């Protein structure tokens, strides 16, 4: 065996971390970064620098490198590709040995892949576009507490998307009035109602009071309709201890589902809460508050498809995904891609939808995709077509803004949904024939008729900021 000798000093990253001859192993974690280097920094050096700074490297050689097997543990930049329509940026593909990461810890994965390297001076912009988690790593993660099929069985709801509503105004209601709003929505035909992401335990409505009034409303609506109902009780809290306290109380009063803001609340807290939900038979709804700060800039940050994968590993039964047709950012092809990443067992590479790697989830359960944000009854045909059955279609203002009140808004959405599902099952093109389908259903539903009249001119036709790079070709 050759004796390794230490040579002090600074050398180019490419000498150690650029390996175009490398063939990734099935057990490697693979990452695709979009890199915009500083002027004068060539592609190979920039890619190697990212590989180094996100794995074992530092700015100079160190003698302690001789105490370990650097050839095994280092990240390897193994491929570079052009970014369509962008001469300044390029894609760098980097392979990391699985042993660089703690088992079952999305926190540890992110600390390396999106840690200090994102402040590296050699690059002007850096975006994590996609990650391939090998099955060997997937199996170390807890994943969704229950998954799609178990939730359908718990709630006894099959053959259609689920219907939800975020209670508005999002802040300022008393617990009693909040519970009243929940009751009207659930008795009108919705499956779920929801705390808004920024409802925690404020002076106008403390969490315990809200939980009690909401659970009473839920049970009353169940008794009157004969259907299972639920309300996403947000247990996000200042400390993990307080979060678990709220979750335990929700379980004690019989709530079937709780909620967590997984980015603002933190990945450690989310992973722990998902495990608690699995152990205690409680469903877990996940909100993505703060995601756009991280994922909306097309040249720097983390793409939402990565945040989607991280959530599936960390754990959640629902995740907000955007709507395509509503008020929030969301390119259609990209959205369809990350919806599949949430729900399917195996997703092949598909650049047309922004998916850079095959992803095998093995037996890990899927996650309901939640469409929420600026949607109303006129969007129903498109939503059913885009999201399919394993989704939650969540109408906030599109329920509570009905001229006749919450129950009428809920009834309008339920009639519209069932009309679209029936038409789809008959083989009709529900997006093209949506107006005719809804108009026919409205003949038997005055609530739907009024809703259609109220929102017929409401559209959100702004251009998408974060487009697929393939669209620039």
From Swiss-Prot:
PROSITE patterns: RUBISCO_LARGE (PS00157)
EC number: 4.1.1.39
Matching InterPro entries: RuBisCO (IPR033966), RuBisCo_large_chain_AS (IPR020878), RuBisCO_lsu_C (IPR000685), RuBisCO_lsu_C_sf (IPR036376), RuBisCO_lsu_fd_N (IPR017443), RuBisCO_lsu_N_sf (IPR036422), RuBisCO_lsuI (IPR020888)
Coiled coil regions in record: none
Active site: 168, 287
GO MF annotations in UniProt: magnesium ion binding; monooxygenase activity; ribulose-bisphosphate carboxylase activity
Name of the protein in question: Ribulose bisphosphate carboxylase large chain
Organism: Halothiobacillus neapolitanus (strain ATCC 23641 / c2) (Thiobacillus neapolitanus)
Lineage: Bacteria, Pseudomonadati, Pseudomonadota, Gammaproteobacteria, Chromatiales
């Amino acid at each position: 065996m050759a004796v390794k000798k230490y040579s002090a000093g600074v050398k180019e990253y490419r000498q150690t971390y650029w390996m175009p001859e490398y063939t990734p192993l099935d057990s490697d974690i693979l990452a695709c970064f979009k890199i915009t280097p500083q002027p004068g920094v060539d592609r190979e050096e920039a890619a190697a620098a990212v590989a180094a700074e996100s794995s074992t490297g530092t700015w100079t050689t160190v003698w302690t490198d001789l105490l370990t097997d650097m050839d095994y543990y280092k990240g390897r930049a193994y491929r570079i590709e052009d970014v369509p329509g962008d001469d300044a940026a390029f894609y760098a593909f980097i392979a990391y040995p699985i042993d660089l990461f703690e088992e079952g810890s999305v926190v540890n994965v992110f600390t390396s892949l999106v840690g200090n390297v994102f402040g590296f001076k050699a690059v002007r912009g850096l975006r994590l576009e996609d990650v391939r988690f090998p099955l060997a790593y997937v199996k170390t993660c807890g994943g969704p507490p229950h998954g799609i099929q178990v939730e359908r069985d718990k709630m006894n709801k099959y053959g259609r998307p689920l219907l939800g509503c975020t209670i508005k105004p999002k802040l300022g209601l008393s617990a009693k009035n909040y519970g009243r709003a929940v009751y009207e929505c659930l008795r009108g035909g919705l499956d779920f109602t929801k705390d808004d992401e920024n409802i925690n335990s404020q002076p106008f409505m403390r969490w315990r009071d809200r939980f009690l009034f909401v659970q009473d409303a839920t049970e009353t609506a169940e008794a009157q309709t004969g259907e299972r109902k639920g309300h996403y009780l947000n247990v996000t809290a200042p400390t993990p201890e307080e979060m678990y306290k709220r979750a335990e109380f929700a379980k004690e009063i019989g709530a079937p589902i709780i909620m967590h803001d997984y980015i603002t609340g933190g990945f450690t807290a989310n992973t722990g809460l998902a495990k608690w939900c699995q152990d205690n038979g409680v469903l877990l709804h996940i909100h993505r508050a703060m995601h756009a700060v991280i994922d909306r800039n097309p040249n720097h940050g983390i793409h939402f498809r990565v945040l989607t994968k991280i959530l599936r590993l960390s754990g959640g039964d629902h995740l907000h995904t955007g709507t395509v047709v509503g008020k929030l950012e969301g390119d259609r092809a990209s959205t369809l891609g990350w919806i599949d990443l949430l729900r399917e067992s195996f997703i092949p590479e598909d650049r047309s939808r922004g998916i850079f790697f095959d992803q095998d989830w093995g037996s890990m359960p899927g996650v309901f995709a939640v469409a929420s944000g600026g949607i109303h009854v006129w969007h129903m045909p498109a939503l059913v077509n885009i999201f399919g059955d394993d989704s939650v279609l969540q109408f906030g203002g599109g329920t509570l803004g009905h001229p006749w009140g919450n129950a009428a808004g809920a009834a309008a959405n339920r009639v519209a949904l069932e009309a679209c599902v029936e038409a789809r099952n008959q083989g009709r093109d529900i997006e093209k024939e949506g107006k005719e389908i809804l108009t026919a259903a409205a003949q038997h539903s005055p609530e739907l008729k009024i809703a259609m009249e109220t929102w017929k001119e409401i559209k959100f036709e702004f251009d998408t900021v974060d487009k697929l790079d393939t669209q620039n070709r």
